[in-house]
């Protein structure tokens, strides 16, 4: 079954840089082999700007700049991104509602998201000691 979305309260507590770090951890390196994606992000409510860069099987971000040759650039409120991640809306719905503006090729974001792994939220931290059967 699909994993439930991250709660909106949890998302709101994360700084935007931390949110990009979460994405970086979820990146499936072998699937990203040979891919390069550059995305500009500008958040209208926080005034933050970021470049998200996929290169050499790693996803990195830099705050405070925009790449001149980005594949796509997105302008939105950080709260809108939280709504998308929390699955309260979809990226296309938010674009249609005028909450997300973009230039360039927005499909590059979809390509990036297709490279992400889903990890289980709940897992055994300590497992019971298994007795050898003789």
Positions of PLM-derived features:
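Acidic, aliphatic-rich amphipathic alpha-helical segments
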Residues: 1-60, 109-134
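C-terminal interaction segments
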Residues: 1-6, 65-134
